[in-house]
Amino acid sequence: MDSLYKWFSTIYQGKDTCIDQDVFLSTEIQSIEIQPEEKPSEEKQPEEKSSEEKPKLQPVSAINSEKTQKPISSVALPNEDFNKLLYNFPSLSRRPQPKTTTERPQPKTTMDDKQVVVTFITERGRSCELSSERSRYRSPERSRYRSPERSRYRSPERSRYRSPERSRYRSPERSRYRSPERSHYRSPDRSHYRSHNKSTERSHYRSTERSRYRSPERSHYRSPEISRKRSRDESREKSLGRSRKMSRDESREKSLNESHKRSRDESQEKSYEPRPAKKLREKSPDEHQEKHQEKSPEKQVEITKPLEDYIALPKENVPDVFEIEKSQSTRYFSEKARIYFKNTHDGSIVWYKDDAIHRDGDLPAVIESDGTVKYYRDGKIHREGDKPAIIIPGKGKSWYLDGKLHRDGDEPAYVSNDGTLKWYRHGLLHRENDNPAIINLDGSMVWYVDGKLHRGGDLPAIIKPGICFKWYVNGHVHRDNDLPAIINIFKMPKLCNMYRIGDMVWYQHGQRHRSGGKPAIVTFRGVLFYFENGRRIYESPNGKEYYNMTANKLMMDFPYLLE
């Protein structure tokens, strides 16, 4: 800057030689702006010395004022080019020399000095020169999405799914399925990661392998000891030691169990002692016969007695003649009857004879708790005299002969309370004279012959009024004369009491078939499907006219379809 200062001063002095100095100062130096700068007293001494050493610069009054002796920051001169140079280099004042110390004070920058400071930072010095107050979005350390330390999805330390320490599925320490120590399916004896010498009496609450939720005492599904796939030998050994029902003190349990057993045994002995049945069995058979002959005409059990008076007896302990004590009353059974009964778990009563359900005298052999009555003969449901063998209150009646549904005289073998009638012959649905074997309450009828759907005379075997008609021959859907074997009926949506023929299907011996290149399925929407021997060939969507023609012809030939 000193050399630049000298250069401008010499140029200015050369211009003063041609122009009067007094005139120039009065007219040209009106725009001089003097800005004082506060500097310490120590810095003034070197300035005075420098002015004494340079006597040639004294006549330049435009730059250093004689009255103030203060530096001038800017000077406006008549030459325009020179003013431009002054604008590009605004500070013409001589700056003080730097101190000799190593710490050099940085120059103060003001808004008047229109300077642009450009600093070049290398890659090595970037981390040192970066400002600590930088934007939170530009800093890779503070960015929420770019920072590897704060990012939820990219950080390997905080990521929930990628962290091997926190991941539930990948961590070998926390994984439920991979950990050999916590695995639900791996037995501790079969696992090759665990040693067999580990103590079995480890703490249940301090061990990391038996946490609060996976403890074999608290968890029913995760414990390897209680696993369903464990072996039977291991389950028996370990379940006994870790059963929920066992208390902490085994000695108390044993003592309680022994006391309960003793009390039960004593109570049983006491209860069995006063029973008169044992006393009667100890007596001789002659005494039994004498007692029976004396009391049989008066106290012998009759069939008309209410069933609540009887009790259950095991079949093995039934003697020829015995007595039973119940509610301070005695009942006797004679040897001639040879029929006994028992109560089952549901409260029903059954009569037996020679190890088979049987009861004579046209009486029910089974009486259930809901009131159902069944008649048996030699172990088979049977009742003669055209009477029902099974009577279910509120449901219906059934007729049986020798264990099969049967009724003679063209009468239904099953009559339901809702109006359903079914005809059977020797256990098979059957009815002769072209009559339906099943008649339901809704009016639908079904024809059977020897247990098979069948009806001759080109008549439908299944009739559901207003729904469909089906033709069967020997149990197969079939109809001859190129007529549909299934005709569906649908109700007109706008007309309440009007019906129309819907879809039509042609069958031959149980398979969809129609010869002559005609469709085997004709829908009411006009879609045609072609079949041969049950195999579908193709379909045609343009068949509305064909449907109308076929439906109208069927209504004319078979008027009962829409009745």
UniProtKB/Swiss-Prot annotation:
Name the record gives this protein: Uncharacterized protein L116
Organism: Acanthamoeba polyphaga mimivirus
Leader peptide range in chain numbering: none
Domain of life (superkingdom): Viruses
Region named Disordered: 30-303
Compositionally biased residues, Polar residues: 61-72
Compositionally biased spans, kind Basic and acidic residues: 36-56, 101-115, 123-276, 282-303
Family per similarity comment: Belongs to the mimivirus L41 family.
